[in-house]
Curated annotation (Swiss-Prot):
Binding site for Zn(2+) 2: C158, C161, C184, C187
Gene Ontology terms describing biological process: chaperone cofactor-dependent protein refolding; DNA replication; protein refolding; response to heat
Family: Belongs to the DnaJ family.
Its job: Participates actively in the response to hyperosmotic and heat shock by preventing the aggregation of stress-denatured proteins and by disaggregating proteins, also in an autonomous, DnaK-independent fashion. Unfolded proteins bind initially to DnaJ; upon interaction with the DnaJ-bound protein, DnaK hydrolyzes its bound ATP, resulting in the formation of a stable complex. GrpE releases ADP from DnaK; ATP binding to DnaK triggers the release of the substrate protein, thus completing the reaction cycle.
Organism in which the protein naturally occurs: Halalkalibacterium halodurans (strain ATCC BAA-125 / DSM 18197 / FERM 7344 / JCM 9153 / C-125)
Protein name (record): Chaperone protein DnaJ
Organism lineage string: Bacteria, Bacillati, Bacillota, Bacilli, Bacillales
Any Pfam family hit: DnaJ_CXXCXGXG
Entry-linked InterPro entries: DnaJ (IPR012724), DnaJ_C (IPR002939), DnaJ_domain (IPR001623), DnaJ_domain_CS (IPR018253), HSP40/DnaJ_pept-bd (IPR008971), HSP_DnaJ_Cys-rich_dom (IPR001305), HSP_DnaJ_Cys-rich_dom_sf (IPR036410), J_dom_sf (IPR036869)
Gene that produces this protein: dnaJ
Residues of the J domain: 5-69
SUPFAM superfamilies: Chaperone J-domain, DnaJ/Hsp40 cysteine-rich domain, HSP40/DnaJ peptide-binding domain
One GO MF term attached to the UniProt entry: ATP binding
Zinc fingers classed as CR-type: ranges: 128-210
Amino acid sequence: MSKRDYYEVLGVDRNASADEVKKAYRKLARKYHPDVNKAPDAEDKFKEVKEAFDTLSDPQKKAHYDQFGHTDPNQGFGGGGAGDFGGFSDIFDMFFGGGGGRRNPNAPRQGADLQYTMTLEFKEAVFGKETTIEIPREETCHTCSGSGAKPGTKPESCPHCGGSGQLNIEQNTPFGRVVNRRVCHHCEGTGKYIKHKCATCGGKGKVRKRKKINVKVPAGIDHGQQIRLSGQGEAGVNGGPAGDLYIVFNVKPHEFFERDGDDIYCEMPLTFVQVALGDEIEVPTLNGKVKLKIPAGTQTGTSFRLRGKGVPNVHGRGQGDQHVQVRVITPKQLSEKEKELLREFAQMSGGRPDEQDDSFFAKVKRAFKG
């Protein structure tokens, strides 16, 4: 199935700014997040939206996508990579050293990196937390100390490759007879032959276990960000260091707050009377309620800033702000007494907008007159 255009997925123009792309992503991610949207296709749509954002928010990826779209520009050349040209890669390796030379199969090598996705509640990401996770990973076998051989014995040099981990294969080519180096399939490139295998690991030198790891989630971590735990990945090879563990965070949306970087946004519903006469209201923040004065005559859409009431910066650079946007609620059901009072008010005010809006309505009148 062909992929949809990334701009179409986010519903933005091809010339959209980075802020417009980010705003569209936040809106759609909130809409299709699996923890909020229980539709069968919500998770697929969420992944599609994230994939589109990851590409269009990165200048290099965006430039590549704008030029080539979903098409791999190298696919007409064997999908890219010299390895796809079969025997010719070995010829170039011989003349130009493309293979990087002969590697020692017994040299210490770092273990593979691992990735773990951790889901956080909105406020857990804001304030941070300490938790314990359990991950499956390969660890060095303690019975054989990673050698793969039965205790009291040692691995022997592979008789087929002489311990090099590679076999030399002669081949006729248009350039003449050449020698190609291939990984020895007898020892799988290790250069070792284990006659008496360790009963615990079966000769692999590693065993798969579930490891408990303590994780300190930093305050202010955001959705999609990651942290690295050095040395918590797969065990190293031939005594090499262990790989790293990368923890990627999936932050659930909040029903009241929205987050953009270190700033928090929310809407406060107010009545016509409150905004017309002014009022002092209580506003929920991440750290509890605070009082906010609403000046008389406040219009719907007006935004107030609560400095320092946002999210702590994950790198320790201060704290964001909270933005409170006023939303005037029009009552749907009125008693007869309330209707009578509103009619009386309309007669007293002349049924026309406030003076401060005269300039706006003057523009509307001029527009109708042409």
